[in-house]
């Protein structure tokens, strides 16, 4: 049992596929899908305003670091398409990192700089980085969706051989 846990909130398109892949990583204790980063209180699937479909992750940082979690996040979705993942188009499907501490913000910005420098994606990263606000849990039918419906829709996948290099830091 973990002695301390951290919380991460990520958005990268339809939350079904994000949850299905992220929950499998060693060190991920729990996940739930919902809505975050927007303007509607008590958001629902039918009424989520400007929120993104997001996943809340509780993880053990002794097993998986926040940096590693973000590297995997960038491996399973395209962070260079604004308001879109696969066939899903709209603000709900934007790429976003909602940080819970100054350290998470620093790691997020550093990881994005590495993704941009790597050339692994065809364009510049458009992932939003913003403080975590309210997280509105999605309806029960959306939780663990692809576990219930293994052949259900997803546009997320692990890209084989994808490894994010760390860029050379400028000497100050």
Curated annotation (Swiss-Prot):
Belongs to the MsrA Met sulfoxide reductase family. It comes from Mesorhizobium japonicum (strain LMG 29417 / CECT 9101 / MAFF 303099). The gene is msrA1. One of its GO terms (molecular function) is L-methionine:thioredoxin-disulfide S-oxidoreductase activity. It is an enzyme of class 1 (oxidoreductase). InterPro entries: Met_Sox_Rdtase_MsrA_dom, Met_Sox_Rdtase_MsrA_sf. This is Peptide methionine sulfoxide reductase MsrA 1. The keyword Oxidoreductase applies. Gene3D superfamilies: Peptide methionine sulphoxide reductase MsrA. Has an important function as a repair enzyme for proteins that have been inactivated by oxidation. Catalyzes the reversible oxidation-reduction of methionine sulfoxide in proteins to methionine. Keywords: Oxidoreductase. It catalyses: L-methionyl-[protein] + [thioredoxin]-disulfide + H2O = L-methionyl-(S)-S-oxide-[protein] + [thioredoxin]-dithiol; [thioredoxin]-disulfide + L-methionine + H2O = L-methionine (S)-S-oxide + [thioredoxin]-dithiol. GO terms for biological process: protein modification process. Pfam families: PMSR (PF01625). The active site is at residue 14. SUPFAM superfamilies: Peptide methionine sulfoxide reductase. Its EC number is 1.8.4.11. PANTHER family: PEPTIDE METHIONINE SULFOXIDE REDUCTASE, PEPTIDE METHIONINE SULFOXIDE REDUCTASE MSRA 2.
């Amino acid at each position: 049992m973990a002695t301390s846990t951290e919380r991460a909130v990520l958005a990268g398109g339809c939350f079904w596929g994000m949850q299905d892949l992220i929950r499998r990583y060693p060190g991920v204790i729990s996940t739930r899908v919902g809505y975050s980063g927007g303007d509607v209180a008590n958001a629902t699937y039918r009424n989520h305003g400007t929120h993104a479909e997001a996943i809340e992750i509780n993880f053990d940082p002794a097993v998986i670091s926040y940096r590693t979690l973000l590297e995997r996040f960038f491996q399973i979705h395209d962070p260079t398409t604004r308001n879109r993942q696969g066939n899903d188009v709209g603000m709900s499907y934007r790429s976003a990192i909602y940080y819970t501490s100054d350290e998470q913000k620093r790691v997020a910005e550093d990881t994005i700089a590495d993704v941009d420098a790597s050339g692994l994606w065809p364009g510049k990263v458009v992932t939003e980085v913003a403080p975590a606000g309210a997280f509105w849990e999605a309806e029960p039918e959306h939780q663990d969706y692809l576990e219930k419906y293994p052949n259900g829709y997803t546009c997320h996948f692990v890209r084989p051989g994808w490894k994010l290099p760390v860029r050379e830091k400028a000497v100050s």
